[in-house]
Amino acid sequence: MKKIITLSAPPPSQFSFLSEFQFSLPELRQIQFKSYYYFIYKNLISELNIFPEIFDLNQEFQFELLNKEYKLIKPEKTTIKFHYNTYSSDLYVTCRLLRRKKKIEIQKQTIFIGSIPLIDYQSTFRINSVTRVIINQILRSPGIYYNSELDHNGISIYTGTIISDWGGRLKLEIDSKTRIWARISKKRKVSILVLLLAMGLTIKQILDSVCSSKIFLDFLKEKKKKKEHLQSTEDAMVELYKQLYYIGGDLLFSESIRKELQKKFFQQRCELGKIGRLNVNKKLSLDIPENEFFLLPQDILAAIDYLIKIKFGIGTLDDIDHLKNRRIRSVADLLQDQLKLALIRLENSVRQVMRRTTKRKRLLSPKNLITQTPLIATFKEFFGSHPLSQFLDQTNSLAEIVHKRRLSSLGPGGVTRRTAGFQVRDIHFSHYTRICPIETSEGMNAGLIASLAIHANVNNWGFLESPFYKISKNVKEEKIINLSAGEDEYYRIATGNCLALDQGTQKIQITPARYRQEFLAIAWEQIHLRSIYPLQYFSVGVSLIPFLEHNDANRALMGSNMQRQAVPLIKLEKCIVGTGLESQVALDSGNVMITKQSEKIMYTDGKKISLLNNTNETVNTHLIIYQRSNNSTCIHQKPQVISKKFLKKGQVLTDGAAILKGELTLGKNILVAYMPWEGYNFEDAILISERLIYEDIYTSIHIERYEIESRNTNQGPEKITKEIPHLENSVLRHLDKNGLVIPGSWVETGDVLVGKLTPQETEESLRAPEGKLLQAIFGIQVTNAKETCLKVPLNGKGRVIDVIWISKKENSSNYEKIIHVYIAQKRKIQVGDKVAGRHGNKGIISKILPRQDMPYLQDGTPIDMVLSPLGVPSRMNVGQIFECLLGLAGYFLGKHYRITPFDEKYEREASRKLVFSELYKASKKTGNLWLFEPENPGKSRLLNGRTGEIFEQAVTVGKAYMLKLIHQVDDKIHARSSGPYALVTQQPLRGRSRRGGQRVGEMEVWALEGFGVAYILQEMLTIKSDHIHARYEVLGAIITGEPIPKPKTAPESFLLLVRELRSLSLELDHAVIFEKNLNIKFKDV
């Protein structure tokens, strides 16, 4: 049995003082749970509290919600996975109807107003039995931000941008002539005096309040010269309305102008919210109450003063990309927005019903006024179509956790991938310990999709925090404090490498530290804080990469992304070299079952575990058996306990997908060699041994779901039956008497899974007398139904593991039933599959060699995988070499290693010394001197499997942890003989799902021209593409064996071009010039 050795620190005697600081990693999904808890206990109540009182047209009746009297019903435990149900809680609120004048209560009822989706134990939402997750959005925080920019003349101007809680913006700017404007659109601006007057101030109040009244006096003089009067609030509102909405002509003030400005301008651009008010007060040194959420005139006056100071060099500009100016919109904020929208819709619905009922003089009651549709429909729309509500990535357990910890700058109120510039995407110094600088998407979303650092947390204000150790002269008084991005700038923070220093040497050592956006080397006495963990700066995915510090950041990014694409294998194996976080990821994923208290195992089998708790109650825990994930991988739990055994709280009961004995296991430890082999590993191609196939090393299970609906049509209901005419019995052999496939059957491509007949009208030719005569003569049976069976698609063969029949939904007109058929496939690794390591070293399987032909070690062990040595130097991911060599030593020593990255903090070349020392131990213990050869450390001589000769040069050989990715050739391979054509161009469609063709573009044509294959090129551009007549002629020629005729007419794409030109009134014509006409004079032509 192998033992796990942790090599994350030197012997304890060197820094025994650190034993005082025992800490554990935070729960990796707590951002989801904490935020939803805040929504239920805070935001839900606050939204119900602001629901207004509603009156009828005569102001006689009053309807109101008693906000303190509400309850959420605990949902029943049902198998929602298969029945299109949503895991939600019914919300009941007490409503009251009373007479307004006398305040007499007419009726009081507790009414069901809708359902609120609940978060489950895996921090996900089940909507229509589909697992979804709400990802967090990072946005610019509401408040005021000062910046300098260039105007259209290239002159530098200073601006102050006020961002409202709704996302609207009001920009104040001071130009080169020291005039202050309020910009209301890209092309329109008004004087700041107009805005202040429209907000209710008088000219005297404005002049008395600002520090530089000369600016406003100059503006008033300019208005007098133009004979424009601007003395009152009404005049200013008219002026503002003209600039915003009015087209032309004279305009007089009216109350409708005030209401429209209030609704469309002030509410959208001047409502700061709680966080905006906090930021404005802090920036402008104001003491306005925190419950004043709207922008006040004194806010504008203070903002103007600060803008003038910046103009004259006093004050500081803001960095808009700093994390102190950005906040997280988590589950609570997004759901609160939807609840607010639903209650507005409910308010409008109640008002309409109330007015309609009183107008018809019918009896009013709270139950008749309330409808559940607004709340249910709003949440359904949000979870179904909102860009931040996404299908949970369930490829493996790591993919689930990373998806739940994702941060997105996209979505409503955020940036777009086309307009986002480099500054928004770039790494910012304030991301340190809060947002991972490595893990992000590749392509258009680079820098816009990020991941939380492993210790980062979101506070109640929506700002990212990170923990630090506070340094004290007395070591026992040191403690952990959480700081947000703006707070840590005032401290000198030592980086993670100082943790390994001895307490006695720290006082005289120069330590690298971070202070005010710079990295310094200062004495230890000047340090205020220090990091708590070397991996504190990185996300979960990056933290699982061993020897991370030896990799280029781009390859670490690819490695972290590809770990999320690893397919769970049938035979699991722990990595020999890891970082120690594998168990934390496995436990926090929610895919393993753990004991909630001290319990005794009474019974266990493959489907359930029976537990006896402290109160002598037997609790049956049912396991997840061969369940399909969102990514068509297999979720399967196996018990890891035996009967009659006592367990403590928190112990693991089961394994899950890609989880073995409580640790994340994404791949396999296999023997790799870095060497070229007859060109088969050219350009990242990979050569593998047949052992990986025959011993099911990389075999995985994939479950596909096929769906068919049975509806009521105009001709009658569709019928599920086994009796399908015109189909052979061989394709119907797996159907039962009801027309459904029998679970456990092995089905091949083309086999019928569900037999279905759709009614249709009989053709007119068969209803005529001559048609009936032909039926009688030839015995033709007239069928009035069309076969629309569900069949196994191409590459869909496998074992049917389940058939689910979902009954008719309520309140649905033409919906009858849905049938789901689940087919499991066991896929072995094959040519075309993608494999990768944890260091961004990826490749495609190019050839599978027999074991006897593979290069082999000096003890006769054949190599499992041959990688290209040219894939290491240029990519600069040397961590894979350290991993495979240490893995080889661990394999022969029977050890597993858990290594914290950045071990060079202990001494120079620490990783190299560790690897070589372990290889030396392995060679001594096993007697295999080739494991460590002093002249070629880390390399050994290999023998050619075909000839038995020793290769000329020593080869790097080791045990690497390689992953099989979800990009598999079975899902991608595609061929087309015939298929659908586009209606306009008559060319084959595009894409595998449409049975499309391969595009031959401009460069492909050049390549074929270069090889001189004229006939192949002509066929590709005409017969195989869009020449309609030639297609039919070629088919006939092939059948009869005649030579393929040459096309005599133009292809359809040329005819399409002619039609397009005709639509532009251009006509193409052609003329033949004979030899006798060549002497025609030029002027005649």
Swiss-Prot record:
Biological processes annotated in GO: DNA-templated transcription
UniProt keyword Transcription present: yes
Localisation: Plastid, Chloroplast
DNA damage as UniProt keyword: no
A single GO cellular-component term on record: mitochondrion
SUPFAM superfamilies: beta and beta-prime subunits of DNA dependent RNA-polymerase
Example of a GO MF term: DNA-directed RNA polymerase activity
InterPro entries, A to Z: DNA-dir_RNA_pol_bsu_ext_1_sf, DNA-dir_RNA_pol_su2, DNA-dir_RNAP_su2_dom, DNA-dir_RNAP_su2_hyb_sf, RNA_pol_bsu_bac, RNA_pol_bsu_CS, RNA_pol_Rpb2_2, RNA_pol_Rpb2_2_sf
Catalyzed reaction equations: RNA(n) + a ribonucleoside 5'-triphosphate = RNA(n+1) + diphosphate
Keywords assigned by UniProt, alphabetized: Chloroplast, DNA-directed RNA polymerase, Nucleotidyltransferase, Plastid, Transcription, Transferase
Enzyme Commission number: 2.7.7.6
Family: Belongs to the RNA polymerase beta chain family.
Reported function: DNA-dependent RNA polymerase catalyzes the transcription of DNA into RNA using the four ribonucleoside triphosphates as substrates.
Cited PANTHER family: DNA-DIRECTED RNA POLYMERASE I SUBUNIT 2
Subunit structure: In plastids the minimal PEP RNA polymerase catalytic core is composed of four subunits: alpha, beta, beta', and beta''. When a (nuclear-encoded) sigma factor is associated with the core the holoenzyme is formed, which can initiate transcription.
Stated name of the protein: DNA-directed RNA polymerase subunit beta
Lineage: Eukaryota, Viridiplantae, Streptophyta, Embryophyta, Bryophyta
Name of the gene: rpoB
